Regions:
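C-terminal accessory helical subdomains adjacent to catalytic cores in phosphodiester-
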Residues: 1-15, 25-47, 66-201
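Phosphate/oxyanion-binding active-site loops and adjacent basic polyanion-contact surfaces
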Residues: 20, 24, 49-61, 192-196
Length: 201
C-alpha cells in the first residue's frame, strides 16, 4: 500500500477483501490509519460470501464489478484488487489462485484501464506474516505452531486492532524473511511456509 510516485498525484485506488472478518481487516485498516491513507483510496472489506479462498476471490470480483451502494463503493472504482486468504485445509485454494490469476489484467476499471487483481495467500495462515517479524522460519508450520506468536506478543489475540503497532518496528526483518521464502520456494507448486502479505505492506 505504499505511495506511488510520478505517475499520478494521488494514490492508486485499492480494494482489499479478506477471508477473516477481524484480524486481516483490522491489520490493513491500522496500516491505512498509520500512513494516513484516505478510505477512498484504500477500501478494506471482509468477504461476505464466506471464508473459503474461492469465495474470497469471487466476492472481491463481485464487489469490484458491481460495487455496493450500501457501503458507498462505486462500480469498478479501483486500480488494484487484492483477495487475502489462508491456505489452511481449504479445498478451493488452488481454484482461488487460478481464478485470481485469470482476472489479473482482464477486468477494467471506471477509467477503462486494466486492473491488477492478485491473490494474497499465506501458508498456513496470516499469522505467519506476524511471526516473521520475530523469527526466521524455513520449515513448514502447522497452523497451531503459528500461535507461538504469543511468545513474542504476550496476550496476542486474533482480531485485536493493534498488530501493526506492536510488530511495526520489525517490519524490515519480516519483509526480508518473507521475500526470502518467496524466492526459496518459487520453484515449488506448493510453497510452505509462504506469505504474500509482504506484497501489500
Amino acid at each position: 500500500m505504499e505511495r506511488k510516485q510520478g505517475r499520478r498525484a494521488s494514490y492508486d485506488r485499492i480494494l482489499i477483501v479478506s477471508e477473516g472478518s477481524k484480524t486481516e481487516p483490522n491489520y490493513f485498516r491500522e496500516i491505512r490509519a498509520t500512513y494516513r491513507l484516505h478510505t477512498a483510496n484504500v477500501e478494506v472489506r471482509p468477504s461476505e460470501l464466506g471464508s473459503a479462498p474461492i469465495q474470497v476471490v469471487q466476492y472481491a470480483q463481485a464487489l469490484f464489478e458491481d460495487g455496493d451502494r450500501h457501503k458507498n463503493i462505486q462500480r469498478r472504482a479501483f486500480e488494484k484488487v487484492y483477495a487475502v486468504f489462508d491456505r489452511d485445509d481449504h479445498d478451493s485454494y488452488h481454484d482461488a489462485l487460478a481464478l485470481a490469476a485469470s482476472l489479473d489484467g482482464k477486468l477494467k476499471n471506471d477509467a477503462k484501464q486494466p486492473i491488477r487483481f492478485q491473490a494474497i495467500a499465506s501458508v498456513p495462515s496470516f499469522e505467519l506474516w506476524l511471526l516473521l517479524h520475530y523469527e526466521d522460519i524455513q520449515a513448514p508450520l502447522h497452523r497451531n505452531e503459528v500461535m507461538r506468536l504469543k511468545l513474542h506478543i504476550p496476550g496476542y489475540d486474533k482480531g485485536a486492532g493493534n498488530a501493526f503497532a506492536i510488530t511495526g518496528e520489525h517490519l524490515a526483518a519480516a519483509t526480508q524473511r518473507a521475500e526470502a521464502l518467496a524466492k526459496r520456494f518459487s520453484a515449488h507448486t506448493e510453497p510452505e511456509p509462504f506469505t504474500a502479505i509482504v506484497d501489500l505492506v
